[in-house]
Amino acid sequence: MSSSLIEVRKNNLPAYAVFAAMLSAAGLPIYIHAPKYFVDEYGVSLAALGSVLFVLRLFDVVQDPLLGRLSARLGRRRVFAISIACVVMALGMLGLFAVEPLVSPLVWFGLMLTLVFSAFSFLTINFYAQGVVTASSLGQFGHLRLARWRESGALFGVCIAAIAPLVFLYFIDAPFDGFAIGFAVLALVAGTMMRAEWAEGRGLKSAGFQTVLQDPIARRLLIIAFVNAAPVAVSSTLFLFYVEARLMSPGMEGPLLLLFFLSAAFSVPLWGGVAEKLGTKSTLMISMTLAIVAFGFAIFFGAGDWLAFAVVCVASGAALGADLTLLPAMFAKRMGEISPAATEGFGLWSFVSKFTLAFSAVLLLPALQWAGFESGSDSNSSHSLFVLALLYAAVPCVLKIFALILLAFTAVSEE
């Protein structure tokens, strides 16, 4: 690979950051905002919302692998299909937050999320698969270099999306309308910036699902991704409830969310530098340990402890930065070795990553309701608040420990 060509590919990396920001804005922030929005605005029960989210993720059991296979077969039509998916996701987000439900709120919630999640799946699979092709042309540590741009953009996208409705609240009467419109504009801009990149993946032969699933390292990395992503899914789903009810600090949700995601975003280049010196696996194990310690403290916080929790947000946010950068880079590197087209591999990766969010929704939200917890109430019992603390902090600790053990016994390259 000539140095001039490598330099050209480096100049295209900002497009990956912007596109990742758009995708991430439709990921975790939806789980942060949508359940609470539909509870507060339309009175939908937590258990019902959790059930809908779980059913949608079960749909992904079939959808994501099939979308991966479809992507591998699109050929020259891929650019057009990706453009359509960007438009569909923008329309779904507008329908979710900026349009009054045309049917019952629960049904509308499910329909709009189906549009958002389906487009999200298709775009994510193609985006990460394209990253394998691009990273292979960037020389040594190419996967880490691309991951820094991609995940930094993703985390800044999460930061903006997480606090945007809270910020818009000070300027407009319908903050979620502003959020949805802003997302739609970002989707169009990001799709335009990445348009030239999609052609690079043409002509690569698909290796199929069997190649990915029969590879012991790829299989183990998928399992680790599932277990390691679950703590993020759990804490993201319960974050607003934890700050509002357990810490009794209404109004601090926005600043604490921003602190958490900014810490993650600014940690990405630092983790990348450490990984180049210590190795990717060793660095990821360090970050997992940091997350375990941080969530361990959060179990014991109570009313008014928002300042101590801010420290936890910094530490756990930094750990998230490593999770989102290093683990996908490890998987992408493996896909480059066994399945260069990578679409089926990232179809499986997308399913695994999102199924953890379904796990959190279907188990945690109903569990909170059964414990007697009520969102926005000042009279939640000590038992329900204790259950909230256990679900928010103790469950992620246990899952992270399991992921750390799995990674320790996985033979992967440190590059």
Language model features with spans:
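Membrane-embedded alpha-helical bundles of multi-pass transporters/translocases
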Residues: 2-415
